[in-house]
A protein has these predicted regions:
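Active-site metal-binding loops of divalent metal-dependent hydrolases
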Residues: 50-51, 79-80, 108, 124, ...
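Acidic/histidine-rich helix-loop elements
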Residues: 48-63, 136-144, 148-150, 210-223
Length: 324
């Protein structure tokens, strides 16, 4: 609790002043990526990389960025690939000339955090989960899709941290911003960012509307936590709340229901086969995702893809066998 109070004091001090790289996509040609801007509320924007260039994210290169603009300075959610920082800054400058003061990370992966150091060097204060900082400070582990993690750079590490039971509330630019930690879901250090007045929640990668769920168990993610995070999202969101995933199009609360039901359906089938003594290979051969493959965009991705059906089912099997 002491660390939480210190974190809150640092945040408040920084706010007072403001008022007075998942691993880089293999084979990605960053020179071909454009940063696209979508206005989602009066002073809230979503920045996205253009589609079809990043092999790891065909729908849009890298992760989504949130930008809250106003006289108190720019508040950013996530930082994209480091190679795209200049393009991201150029897109922000078309929105506002105010300094970039705050940056919060939804989770560990380099497509959301690799640009951290660049923005910190511009003067941004970096906030994230204590668990995320711990993950980023450890020697790199490969992510669950086999990509190497980005090399550790101390400048990428959060300065202000908060724990699972210590949500942070910021007030700036006429908005109330809630940093809401969730249990180990996509990774072990996930955060949802809610903009109360705009009725927008940025939910990171524990939901995606392209491919099957990607739960990075190498970096603390868990199937149980992902389901809990989806439940938490449905509790927080109203019928008109805009939910911004780390990848894919903006959704609403109703879109979470079939996604969660799909996970529960696959989980139940895999659990049944485990009880029958089936091996992982036998479960994969049974094609337990077949009822969903035609409904999930990208549901028929090749087996090697990070969000393919086979990788998802393998993760579910391993989590259930491990009792998690």
């Amino acid at each position: 609790m002491k660390s939480a109070r210190r974190s809150s004091l640092v945040v408040l001090a920084a706010l007072a002043l403001s008022v007075n790289g998942r691993a880089q996509g293999p084979g990605t040609d960053y020179s071909k990526i454009e940063i696209l801007t979508e206005k989602i509320a009066p002073n809230l924007y979503m920045l996205s990389g253009s589609a079809g260039v990043d092999p790891g994210h065909q729908d849009a290169a890298g992760g989504r960025i949130g930008v809250l603009a106003g006289p108190d300075g720019i508040f950013m959610v996530d930082a994209q690939y480091a190679q795209l920082t200049d393009k991201v800054v150029a897109a922000i400058r078309k929105i506002s000339s105010e300094p970039i003061r705050f940056l919060v990370n939804t989770h560990l992966h380099g497509d959301h955090t690799a640009g951290n150091a660049n923005f910190v060097k511009m003067g941004a204060l970096l906030l994230a989960r204590e668990e995320l900082r711990d993950e980023m400070a450890r020697p790199p582990a490969p992510s669950a899709n086999g990509n190497p993690a980005p090399a550790r750079d101390p400048a990428r590490l959060p300065v202000v941290t908060y724990g699972l039971g210590d949500p942070v509330k910021l007030r700036l630019n006429g908005e109330i911003v809630d940093l809401i930690p969730v249990r180990a879901a996509h990774t072990g250090g996930d955060t949802m960012i809610r903009f109360e007045n705009a009725d927008v929640i940025m939910i990171g990668d524990f939901y995606r509307n392209y491919g099957y769920p990607f739960i990075d168990t190498n970096n603390g993610g868990s199937l149980k936590g992902a389901l809990e995070a989806l439940d938490a999202t449905m509790r927080l969101a109203g019928p008109n709340t805009k939910l911004v995933p780390g990848h894919g199009t903006i959704i609403n609360r109703a879109d979470i229901v079939p996604y969660r039901d799909m996970i529960l359906g696959v989980q139940a089938k895999v659990q049944q086969m485990i009880a029958q003594g089936r091996t992982q290979q036998e479960v994969l051969a049974a094609k337990v995702t077949a009822p969903y493959d035609g409904k999930v965009p990208g549901g028929l991705l090749p087996a090697g893809a990070g969000t393919s059906a086979d990788r998802f089912v393998s993760m579910v099997y391993q989590q259930l066998k491990g009792g998690r």
